[in-house]
């Protein structure tokens, strides 16, 4: 099958979900698309990317040949997994170029693709969610999809400011107290249980964190205000998405518009759902 006949669509992601630092991720219904450039032709709204783009680096590192284009609605540097989605798209596009355009072949290779994407990204939470879809738990090279008994709306409050994940991570402590570690382990377990049983009453306490969120919010007063505003509504829960500055809010679809109206006007609000498909070849 010719290169011109396929492209890859990959969802954005929200990492950590509060306590699940570097382990939990959620795929979201805003997407990045990538495909090979053939005869210099790219689709409307797309752009050819240079060798420094994370998607191009991933494509070449996995054996892809030629140039690639990208078309994306995922905000960059906002905590919605743009770089992770680009890296997943790059390795999946290279795999399709080498092994054929088949989602069955893609599914069979997901563990290897996860490993390649994680090596490039440095942590698995975003890339696992973007590759597999749904809510994912990943560690030690393995990933599982968390069964969901909920069909929530996810509001993403997205300000104009950007955050460098690398710089944000350097601000975090290299050691933890035993009590903080125990709280986060317990909350992560509680969160997985609440999502899989549909017990929304547990979600607020289950998304509380003691490892990274307060440290990051101390340098992001706008995000802190958005998180506080979200938690003053009847939203089920809210968390700092990845390293921020985006704040993710989980709620019932029927409450989404009312909750969105109460978030600070210093950011845009995207009304999203959980993407259940992950990376797909089209």
Task: Label every model-predicted segment.
Residues 1-78, 95-109, 272-277, 281-282:
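ATP-binding N-lobe of GHMP and related small-molecule kinases
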Residues 2, 14-16, 25-28, 79, ...:
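Solvent-exposed alpha-helices and their adjacent loops that cap or buttress functional pockets
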Residues 9-11, 27, 130-133, 139, ...:
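Short beta-strand segments
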Residues 12, 30, 134, 158-163, ...:
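Glycine-rich beta-alpha junction loops
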Residues 36-37, 130-140, 248-252, 282:
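Short beta-strand-to-turn element immediately C-terminal to the catalytic PLP-Schiff-base lysine
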Residues 64-145:
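Gly/Ser-rich oxyanion-binding loop with an adjacent helix/lid
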Residues 156-218:
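Active-site rim beta-loop-alpha module in soluble metabolic enzymes
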Residues 195-282:
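Glycine-rich, charge-dense phosphate/pyrophosphate-binding loop(s)
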């Amino acid at each position: 099958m010719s290169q011109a006949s396929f492209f890859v669509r990959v969802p954005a992601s929200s990492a950590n979900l509060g306590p699940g630092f570097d382990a939990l991720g959620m795929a979201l219904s805003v997407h990045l698309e990538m495909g090979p450039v053939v005869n210099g032709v790219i689709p409307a709204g797309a752009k050819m990317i240079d060798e420094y783009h994370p998607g191009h680096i991933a494509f070449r590192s996995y054996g892809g040949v030629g140039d690639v284009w990208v078309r994306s609605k995922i905000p960059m540097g906002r905590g919605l997994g743009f770089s992770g989605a680009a890296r997943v798209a790059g390795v999946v596009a290279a795999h399709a170029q080498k092994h054929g355009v088949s989602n069955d072949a893609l599914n069979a290779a997901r563990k290897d693709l996860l490993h390649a994407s994680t090596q490039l990204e440095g942590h698995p939470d975003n890339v696992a969610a973007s590759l597999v879809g749904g809510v994912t738990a990943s560690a030690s090279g393995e990933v599982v999809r968390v069964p969901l008994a909920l069909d929530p709306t996810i509001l993403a409050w997205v300000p104009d400011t950007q955050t460098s994940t690398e710089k944000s991570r350097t601000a975090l402590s290299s050691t933890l107290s035993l009590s903080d570690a125990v709280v986060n382990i317990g909350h992560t377990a509680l969160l997985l249980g609440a999502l899989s049983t549909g017990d929304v009453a547990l979600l607020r306490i289950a998304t509380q964190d003691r490892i990274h969120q307060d440290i990051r919010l101390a340098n992001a007063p706008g995000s802190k205000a958005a998180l506080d505003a979200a938690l003053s509504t009847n939203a089920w829960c809210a968390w700092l998405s990845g390293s921020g500055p985006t704040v993710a809010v989980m709620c019932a679809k029927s409450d989404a518009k009312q909750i969105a109206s109460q978030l600070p006007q210093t950011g845009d609000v995207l009304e999203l759902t959980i993407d259940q498909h992950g990376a797909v070849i089209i």
